[in-house]
Amino acid sequence: MNLKKMMMASALLMAACCMQAQTKVIAHRGFWKTPGSLLKADSIGCYGSEFDVWIAKDNKLVVNHDPVYKMRPMEYSKGDALTGLKLSNGENLPSLEQYLEAGKNCNTRLILELKAHSNKKRETKAVQGILAMVKKMGLENRMEYITFSLHAMKEFIRLAPAGTPVYYLNGELSPKELKELGAAGLDYHMGVIKKHPEWIKEAHDLGLTVNVWTVDEVEDMKWLIEQKVDFITTNEPVILQEELKKF
């Protein structure tokens, strides 16, 4: 290989590495948590689209952020009663199956948050149901799992296929503790990272990745990009994409 070709190859390799290392955008609540909004998040090129899952009284898995919607508690209502509810955009509250079906038509990663439930038994049941459905639908390679529940995180790590990214949201565990538990990284609130900025380097030194949520202020976006966090979860993915172009 002559010198010119070697220089071109080196430049391409450096560019590829820079692209790979750039902070990636995750749309909070799927831009906003319906099959239609998932497609929107995909259309603007987000790395991932985050959505929240509950297990209903009859074990049906449904997608919704809050524990109660239109006076119907997610955990204590039947699934059909929940999926019959209309959302503000006119879509019905989706089942997990409906949401994942829409996900088949996307390229974006599916970032599933299992909400903390009333007891560990229900969380384990939810983890088992989620993993079975994801496998049936052929989406195992597209999924990442996040949760505030330490028990649910451990269950995802125990039961999901080896190498599946699982992250913890609650914020009290250090990168070293997360590594020991088998987590892929930390997924912490902006306030936690501001309090412990050293955790970014500690996590990277341990081979873990760092996601920060929910970041909507431009100055916070800039600071996190400068700190080289791996992912930023935001309600303003278009604004974040514009900021990333400046780096």
Per-range role (PLM):
Residues 1-23:
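Bacterial Sec-dependent N-terminal signal peptides
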Residues 21-247:
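Phosphate-group recognition and catalysis centered on beta-loop-alpha active-site segments
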